[in-house]
Amino acid sequence: MHRGKGMKFVGDSRIPAVRKPNIPKDYSEYPGKTEVFWPNFLLKEWLVGSVFLVGFLCLTVAHPSPLERIADPTDTTYIPLPDWYFLFLYQLLKYSYASGPYTVIGAIVMPGLAFGALLLAPFLDRGPERRPWKRPVATGMMLLTLAAIVYLTWESVVTHDWEKAAEQGKIRAEVEIDTNAEGYKIAQANTCTSCHGENLSGGAGPSLVGTGLTAEEIAKIAKEGQGSMPGGIFKGTDEELQKMANSSPA
């Protein structure tokens, strides 16, 4: 019979099983390329986090968040603008194939396919290669998506009317409008309030509050028009025009 054939080693009861408690090494026993979690590693993390926190707080103090006037849901002329990380979706909804009757495609279907593909990427690309040039399909899709996001964001920034956006969101001083005044009733009768708002603070037309215009300039604009406002809208007499201009909150 060969030695060990058919035999099973079940242990030797004469050899004691020494179990030592899991005690961490002393600080002095660590080699030069390693370090203890506390205080070395964790203290460095805290210091880096503190620097970023202080920098972020200084940034918020130096550049506070821009505030606009109180939101008015009845103002149909207001053009909303999302945060910068949603600008590419905002621009996508401007195209004909993703807006109007096709809003569902631009708002749900296309982003859903993109984020769904991102979630399924680890399951679809199961190859052993990790170098980008060895994974042409995955790398190409990533670069195409990144290029589309950058282009749509840039296009949204370029085509947005920033001057109009700053003007429409400007916080204006509240001015009490006497709706019983004769000048206000004249403006209301000539449909001025339908464009400039019931409080003359702006609507489809610009605000008439705090414009700095003189009564003569207001009368001239009301008679001849200016910009997108055509002339001949005011149908009253010269006397009514003068009363309206003199009572303007400009």
UniProtKB/Swiss-Prot annotation:
The protein's name in its UniProt record: Menaquinol:cytochrome c reductase cytochrome c subunit
Organism: Geobacillus thermodenitrificans
Cofactor list: heme c
Gene name of this polypeptide: qcrC
Lineage per the UniProt record: Bacteria, Bacillati, Bacillota, Bacilli, Bacillales
All copies of domain Cytochrome c, residue ranges: 178-250
SUPFAM superfamilies: a domain/subunit of cytochrome bc1 complex (Ubiquinol-cytochrome c reductase), Cytochrome c
Compartments where located: Cell membrane
Stated role: Component of the menaquinol:cytochrome c reductase complex.
Membrane topology reported for the UniProt record: Multi-pass membrane protein
Alphabetized GO MF terms: electron transfer activity; heme binding; iron ion binding; oxidoreductase activity
Annotated positions binding heme c: 192, 195-196
Spans through the membrane: 46-62, 104-124, 137-157
Subunit relationships: The main subunits of the menaquinol:cytochrome c complex are a Rieske-type iron-sulfur protein (QcrA), a cytochrome b (QcrB) and a cytochrome c (QcrC).
InterPro entries from the UniProt entry: Cyt_b/b6_C, Cyt_b/b6_C_sf, Cyt_c-like_dom, Cyt_c-like_dom_sf, Cytb/b6-like_sf, Cytochrome_c550/c551-like, MenaQ_cyt_c_Rdtase_cyt_b/c-su
